[in-house]
């Protein structure tokens, strides 16, 4: 079976729709999917997409502005020990762009209301560090050669000042 290349962007927490799309196109192990950022926020299933992308060897991702906002907010969350600290300018910007559903899904995933606070605190700190490491591992662009053509895949544009 021939390898197919698919490119998508701005999933914004819509894991169910992503699954439906992949089923509809018959996405398989021979195919490759490039996600051009913004898997988080606005939709109900950001955590599901986050883990799905990491589990799949044939899915490649670059960071978008929502991942950048999330990373900045998570870095501040380590300082204030709060995912949605209103003291955080990065969080306020992230919140204006749909962060609350992501924060809610993180709290649900970490079972905030089901475990003792001390355990939740430790689990949250580990999770935040994991998210920061994941976002830091994402490139800002991907170069792809396909059918004798060279492509540069980006989220929203190229800044010549950023390597």
Give the ranges of each region predicted by the language model:
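Feature recognizes metal-dependent phosphohydrolase scaffolds
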Residues: 1-163
């Amino acid at each position: 079976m021939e390898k197919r290349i698919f490119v998508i962007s701005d999933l914004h927490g819509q894991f169910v729709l992503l699954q439906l799309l992949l089923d509809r196109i018959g996405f398989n192990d021979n195919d490759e999917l490039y996600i051009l950022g913004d898997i988080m926020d606005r939709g109900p299933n950001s955590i599901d997409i986050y883990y799905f992308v990491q589990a799949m060897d044939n899915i490649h991702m670059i960071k978008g502005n929502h991942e950048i906002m999330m990373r900045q907010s998570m870095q501040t969350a380590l300082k204030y020990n709060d995912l949605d600290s209103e003291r955080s300018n990065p969080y306020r910007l992230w919140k204006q762009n749909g962060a609350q559903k992501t924060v809610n899904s993180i709290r649900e995933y970490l079972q905030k209301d089901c475990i003792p606070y001390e355990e939740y605190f430790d689990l949250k700190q580990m999770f935040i560090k994991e998210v920061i490491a994941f976002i830091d591992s994402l490139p800002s662009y991907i170069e792809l050669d396909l059918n004798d053509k060279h492509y540069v895949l980006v989220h929203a544009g190229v800044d010549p000042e950023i390597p």
